[in-house]
């Protein structure tokens, strides 16, 4: 059974709903002041085509809003936009609330699996702060896991990190038979090739009115940006694999960057004994994103699982 939800702007609980308070951010993280510019309209901003500026903005946002005192990632790793990433977290909280008499389950007993957590660790950092959930992050890149562990340790955060040692697997080797995760989340590689990734970067440069860079700006290593078959293939593989761990996860979810990919994913979902799936739209400024969620448990069983959290 399918359900659909649509929104018009950032989630109401998103701390960035009304934009950035640059005065607060520079007060909390003075290094940001070096990157503040004045726009033609006379407002303060930063140059979003400058990787160092974006990284420093993220450091300020994480410190001011999520109590993350230390956050540093290698230049080549993905530097995510915090507001959009946090939106996903808030909508996931609503997904759980739908099975818990409209109350958002909070606390360490809520288990969340982050597929492809990356060096940036953004979902465990923000989701842990907002709802105190316990996160397990996985990644195929040992260097990313190493950086993520350093961030967690420096901030004295209890985040479980696991390396996925087989690039052909998503859940296998990560989810054990005795595990029960209430959510999985994923920001999948959305390009089908390195050439597509380069073109995507060039489009972003053009939108910012800049000449293209010789490197993949906006951060991101190959495994973060593209995989064979693009996001449709990646998420389809995730759906196929989910059947083997159907009883270990209440809700499987993944971001879907392209609306046109939804139909193919719905067809894949219909090949499996899924009790319910949802497509949730998230409008973030000029960009509209969405995630797909599916569960092998019927609503009554999900409600019972949530009752056991109390």
UniProtKB/Swiss-Prot annotation:
Q: What is its EC number?
A: 2.1.1.181
Cellular component terms (Gene Ontology): cytoplasm
Its job? Specifically methylates the adenine in position 1618 of 23S rRNA.
| Cell compartments where the protein resides | Cytoplasm
In Swiss-Prot or TrEMBL terms, this protein is called: Ribosomal RNA large subunit methyltransferase F
Q: List the disulfide bonds.
A: none
One GO MF term, please? 23S rRNA (adenine(1618)-N(6))-methyltransferase activity
Q: What gene is it encoded by?
A: rlmF
> For this chain's UniProt record, which GO biological process terms are given?
rRNA base methylation
What species does this protein belong to?
A: Pseudoalteromonas translucida (strain TAC 125)
Chief subcellular location equals cytoplasm
Name the family the entry cites: Belongs to the methyltransferase superfamily. METTL16/RlmF family.
